[in-house]
Amino acid sequence: MKKIAVLGSTGSIGTQTLDVVRNHSDFLKIEVLAANNNDELLEQQINEFKPAIAILHNKEAYEKLKARYVGETKLYYGEEGLIEGATTDKIDTVVTSLMGFAGLRPTMRAIEAGKNIALANKETLVVAGDLVMKKAREKQIGIMPIDSEHGALFQCLHGEDMNKVDKLLVTASGGPFRGKKIEDLKNVSVKQCLSHPTWKMGRKITIDSASLMNKGLEVIEAKQLYNVDYDKIQVVVHPQSIIHSMVQYVDGSVIAQLGSTDMRLPIQYALTYPERMVCPAENLDFWQMKDLTFEKPDTDTFRGLALAYEAGKIGGSMPCVMNAANEIAVEAFLNEQISFLDIYDIIEEAMQSHITLVEPELEDLFEIDSNIRKQVKEKIYKC
């Protein structure tokens, strides 16, 4: 029986993770649930899964739940609560699906405690990949990617010699604005950005998908997970989202992983590896499949991908700067304080003004993240 903590249990990945657990309750057991502020949904999850520990990051939400909850689950709040849940001896695996930078410290503490990681929080590797992967190697724990692209790469690389890899081919849907040019994007609305053509995701990641920043984050994540140079990681726009990623080898052979656009597939694979089990996701019907098309990404229009490559190649503290600026810019766009194209300008300005710290420690990254967020907010509110 695998005992699991789900950090971010009320979000998109978290709720789908719980659906996987429902279907394999003989193999997977929830011991820890954690959410930001959705106390009502968390309470429902507690009543269903009966974990040993539940955490609300928001203290007000915690107080509301504590006032009415009468069960046996221990309730905690705040970052210390998240760390308690991520390091308890009641679990062996942590699903990190907290949004953005907030997932970094609990993930690091979980690794230090020897927990295996099912990673949905790609920002953890973007911001502190060198430190995270080094600690994972020291503790000899596994980091299994939950997102579809890196789960696909993992399967395509499984059992192969990394020295024989020519390219990692990371697929992208192209988002809701595929084929559009800069002029077309000047006045796009939040609602338009949130209309993703193939995937159902949270609001922040859907905006990142529209800007191609999400794919940029995945490029950096791939570099960290598989220790390949950036010139060996290529993004391919594949609008149908049937092929989730591919690996091309030195002999010209390409191995691809295909599947339906259902996040329960990569979640289940990460949690049940090396076993394969029946999944509730719909199987592909090749008789009904028509076209599989591929395009080169337009990085002149969708600058998020180019900015991520630049930040990744510079390394050090630069990916942290890029990520912090992006998170604040996306939040401002969702609140209709800036335009969609302003997101790129804000990220680029933050990167250009930053003097890179080559080998930052974890606390350096927290300080840099805080400073960049403050600077970006000041710029936005002055506009």
Regions found by a protein language model. Give the residues of each.
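Catalytic, metal-anchored helix/loop core of enzyme active sites in primary metabolism
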Residues: 1-383
